[in-house]
């Protein structure tokens, strides 16, 4: 089938329409059910990680290998010309784009991925995270997991917990879910880490219901998805961190009264905001969520690198 994502840069979740999202998710489901080990044979993909990554880098590179793409790149910019000799990002991308069919890039600077698109020519750039700005492929695997467990992406009740101010995953996921109808959001965070006003304004503009809460217990019985994030110690005064840390920890006993099919998600890594006794409950789904990153990223790579795709 012809697809609108061929050679498209994927920098922000807002680069994808609702139809685009549905296309990626449908493709991911097909690849999970029916692997296509030679789909990207003869393609060369650059995996350019200018900062450390575990799940995202390994997930992307596994996705590439399982589709038979050749992978080049680096996991740390310290030993590159950019890191050792002061080469500009623009020159680095200009050169790399002459070698490869696509560039997957993580960078600590917000806006770096968008900047890279100005120097990559016809080679698509896929953002694997740029600072605290965007992480669109995390959102795709989140959506895939929600759809897989709940059977839909509309008319859901979603709670987001923890660092909602600086956490790029919750911003992107809220923006993506707002493209679907009837979703209702519960935001649970300390005042210092509340969801940014621009996200709340966006929900108001779309007529989406949302509310603010001080504890997980307030909403446990009402939600389909509980999306946990880490409260970042470095963002808070030490005394304030000590106060809020215990308030936003999920324990197995907190799941009493939860809906039978409610799933707990987390972008990982977790520190201590989900106790290990939760892992043994049927609600825990964060490791399966991480595994779905393979299929979401395979789908995106396949669509970006094939003008027509028949699965």
UniProtKB/Swiss-Prot annotation:
Pfam families: OTCace (PF00185), OTCace_N (PF02729). GO terms for molecular function: amino acid binding; aspartate carbamoyltransferase activity. Keywords: Pyrimidine biosynthesis, Transferase. GO terms for cellular component: cytosol. It is an enzyme of class 2 (transferase). Its EC number is 2.1.3.2. It catalyses: carbamoyl phosphate + L-aspartate = N-carbamoyl-L-aspartate + phosphate + H(+). L-aspartate binds at residues 85, 168, 230. Carbamoyl phosphate binds at residues 55-56, 106, 135, 138, 268-269. Pathway: Pyrimidine metabolism; UMP biosynthesis via de novo pathway; (S)-dihydroorotate from bicarbonate: step 2/3. GO terms for biological process: 'de novo' pyrimidine nucleobase biosynthetic process; 'de novo' UMP biosynthetic process; amino acid metabolic process. Heterododecamer (2C3:3R2) of six catalytic PyrB chains organized as two trimers (C3), and six regulatory PyrI chains organized as three dimers (R2). Belongs to the aspartate/ornithine carbamoyltransferase superfamily. ATCase family. Catalyzes the condensation of carbamoyl phosphate and aspartate to form carbamoyl aspartate and inorganic phosphate, the committed step in the de novo pyrimidine nucleotide biosynthesis pathway. This is Aspartate carbamoyltransferase catalytic subunit. It comes from Salmonella dublin (strain CT_02021853). The gene is pyrB.
């Amino acid at each position: 089938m012809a697809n609108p994502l061929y050679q498209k840069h994927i920098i922000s979740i807002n680069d994808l329409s609702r139809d685009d999202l549905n296309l990626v998710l449908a493709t991911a489901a097909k690849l999970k059910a029916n692997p296509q080990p030679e789909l990207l044979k003869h393609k060369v993909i650059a995996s350019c990680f200018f900062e450390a990554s575990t799940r995202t880098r390994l997930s992307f590179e596994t996705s590439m290998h399982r589709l038979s793409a050749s992978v080049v790149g680096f996991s740390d910019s310290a030993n590159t010309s950019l890191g050792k000799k002061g080469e500009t990002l623009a020159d680095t991308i200009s050169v790399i784009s002459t070698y490869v069919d696509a560039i997957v890039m993580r960078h600590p600077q917000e806006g770096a991925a968008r900047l890279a698109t100005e120097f990559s020519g016809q080679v698509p750039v896929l953002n694997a995270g740029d600072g605290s700005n965007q992480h669109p492929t995390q959102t795709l695997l989140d959506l895939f997991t929600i759809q897989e467990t709940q059977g839909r992406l509309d008319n859901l009740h979603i709670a987001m917990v923890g660092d909602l101010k600086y956490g790029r995953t919750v911003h992107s996921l809220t923006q993506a879910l707002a493209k679907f109808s009837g979703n209702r959001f519960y935001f649970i965070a300390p005042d210092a880490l509340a969801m940014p006003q621009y996200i709340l304004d966006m929900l108001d503009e779309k007529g989406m219901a949302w509310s603010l809460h001080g504890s997980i217990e307030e909403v446990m019985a009402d939600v389909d998805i509980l999306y946990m994030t880490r409260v970042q110690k470095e963002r808070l005064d030490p005394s304030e961190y000590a106060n809020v840390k215990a308030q936003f920890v999920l324990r197995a006993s907190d799941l009493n009264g939860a809906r039978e099919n409610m799933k707990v998600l987390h972008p990982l890594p977790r520190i201590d905001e989900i106790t290990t006794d939760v892992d043994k409950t049927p609600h825990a789904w964060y490791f399966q969520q991480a595994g779905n990153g393979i299929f979401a990223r395979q789908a995106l790579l396949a669509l970006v690198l094939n003008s027509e795709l028949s699965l």
